[in-house]
Amino acid sequence: MSTYENYSEASKHYDKTRVPVGGEILIGVLALSRKSRSEFRLLDAGCGTGAYAALVLPYVDHIDAMDINPGMLAVAREKLADATSGANIAFHEGSVASMPFEAACFDAVMFNHVLNHLESGQDGNFYGHRTALAEAHRVLRSGGLVVVNCIGHEQLRHGYWYLHLIPTALSACHDRFIPAEKLEAMLSELGFALEGRFVPLDGLFQGAAYFDAEGPLRPEWRKGDSNWALAPEQEISSAEAKIRELRTSGDLGPYLAEHDAKRRQVGQATFFVARKI
């Protein structure tokens, strides 16, 4: 479903430089919501390699993990093999735009950095977002939760020290990520009531690897952030040349620190939580 990344290839390296940012927010939301449910069934829509599913599995009764890419799904199955034996989790190959589930069968649906992959970024209408969220509304029980974990425009500009090195990709990403106000309006139009917007200020997508100033020189490091897939080869080469120049001059560490300074105020991701009316 992704319009810009080959996840069959990326799945081989994804978990080397990627962690589930904001897990504590997700766990808290699900734990509070399940208090009113004797059994709690969660859909991980666009589960990728299963990082978020692994994190929240102890807090729900059952997870259905779905992804359109067989490579990502294979990694998730391997990662969660022990849980599968206890029937806590089931895996499905399918699209978030047409979910292979009956209506009103889930207590929560989570989209973790998925919806931007449904857009070309050219018309500004975000039909991919709307289609997926409408499907979430369909498969949720009354009062069920949808959690959208995505990147805001200010976070794109200031939350990643290296993105300014690939301006074409940064611009393309900006057009694919829905503005917060538009997302909240869309949720309301689709029959959801917004319950909150949360930003994990200390979360890092790449964990400790984020501070590897020479990371952009390595393809496997870049595979942990699909934004690099939107950069033309010439732009990647230019970014690599800049990193090497700074390394040679001894200025690479200060350069990273300078361009990372605002991340502590804006974070790298935003969680939107809404309830089906």
Question: How should these model regions be labeled?
Answer:
Residues 43, 49-98, 131:
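Class I SAM-dependent methyltransferase SAM/SAH-binding core
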